[in-house]
Amino acid sequence: PKIRVGKFEEGRVTLTRDAPFILDARCELGNAQRVGLDYKDLPKDVKPGDVLLLDDGRLKLTVQRVVGHEIHTTVKVGGELSNNKGINRQGGGLTAPALTAKDMDDIRTAALIGVDFVAVSFPKSAADMYMARQLMRAAGCAALLIAKIERTEAVANLDEILDASDGIMVARGDLAVEVGDAAVPALQKKMIRAARDRNKLTITATQMMESMITSPVPTRAEVSDVANAVLDGTDAVMLSAETAAGKYPVEVIESMSRVCEEAEKSAEIGLDRELLNRVFDRIDESIAIAAIWTAYHLKVKAIAALTQTGSTALWMSRPN
């Protein structure tokens, strides 16, 4: 799961550069000097010199020493820190399990309410996804299983995680904190390509139209970001704070929809020319691709996919 700080007496504090700050696994309510942790084993996972990033990297702490259940740090980049914000170690390597007892309860709840997707946060390997799949089956949950790629280890084990999942989420927030902002754009393209090669779905997420939390229109950079995700071949783009806490939830959906529709009109993604040289394992996939190429060259306006299970339509959607 995502590792978080606890709550503060006043709901939030301001950390100043070069000030000492303690992460205390036994602290109940925090203040400007210390705060609790929801992951009690974090002191075992860090050592002096480690860099800890809080609130998606907005604040930065350097570990000075570990004393029992306390992590003594120095604030390197300060700012406001509020309740339940996330913690990452730069470079990854935390031992927190992907699935907790609460996750198992949540999977059972998901089965009862009939959700379409179950996403596993912070998986490290295929083993985490197989465990989630087993729990879903035991609970009678038929949802598609999505791996949120957020850890350095998940990037290294991407192929096996894809094979164990129905799709992946390119979760750029925590991923950027672990691998560095500059590495994320290339990784996004790599992950989408790897998923497409396996006919697995991809969801691209995090700060796609972040400015629309407070602004009625997106920035040009955000428009380009969303469009490029579509051009990369992502199956879905996702909003978070923009709709959960933003002032313009309807407008941001409308804006994102317009950008996606315009990007999908691009001839560059109409057909993937690498498919010409691809060897197909499934007859239905090869027939679907042949139909798409035929339709493209005949300039038809639509394809009617006759299907009983819906799989034909899914196969034919893959070039886009």
Language-model segments: what does each one mean?
Residues P1-N320:
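Non-catalytic helical/linker scaffolds that mediate oligomerization, partner binding
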